[in-house]
Design a protein with these regions (language model features):
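A ubiquitous short alpha-helical element
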Residues: 3-6, 78-79, 94, 126-128
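Short, contiguous alpha-helical
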Residues: 11-23, 27-73, 114-172
């Protein structure tokens, strides 16, 4: 498998996993959705806001070289409907971006400033892998918070995504 094929598979997984978390979050009451649970961004709502903010900000870095909207501003998106809309838009833009990639672009180095303004540079494939891994971390925190509320969600392991995808290919 090439780097490009791997990145495409990881971004398919990332979108699927985000959608499963959003679907599970839709079964929470408003209180449960915003309840402080001790996760990095306090609540299911906060974690989802952070995940989508990171996706949007990294995409902006990759396409324009800068953050057009500060992470803190994007994280102010509140309510499941608004978050769902933000995720849908970020997934659409990420699909377009991933479709435009080639191996040369993935191996290319991108200079950028992080959310604290620190300058760094990394190969695109590392940055893109980071975004998926970052989302996995915060989805796991979200799953833990939901389990603590007695509302566990489905397995989000990558292998289950591939098993489901293989089944869909056979069935359909």
């Amino acid at each position: 498998m090439s780097k490009l094929e791997l990145i495409r598979a990881l971004y398919d997984y990332n979108e699927s996993a985000n959608n499963h978390v959003l679907e599970a979050a839709s079964r929470l009451s408003d209180d449960e959705f915003s309840r402080k649970q001790g996760a990095s961004f306090e609540s299911v709502e906060g974690n989802l806001g952070h995940i989508v903010a990171a996706q949007m900000n990294w995409l902006e870095r990759w396409t324009s070289g800068k953050n057009l909207m500060p992470t803190a501003e994007v994280q102010k998106i509140r309510g499941l409907g608004a978050l769902r809309g933000a995720f849908d838009r970020s997934h659409e833009l990420l699909r377009e971006f991933v479709a435009s990639l080639n191996e040369e672009r993935l191996d290319g180095v991108l200079a950028y400033r992080d959310s604290r303004g620190k300058r760094d540079e990394r190969p695109m494939w590392q940055l893109m892998t980071h975004v998926v891994n970052h989302g996995t971390h915060h989805r796991a925190e979200t799953a833990m918070a939901m389990t603590a509320m007695g509302k566990p969600m489905r397995e989000l392991d990558y292998v289950y995504f591939e098993i489901e995808r293989d089944r869909d290919r056979v069935d359909g």
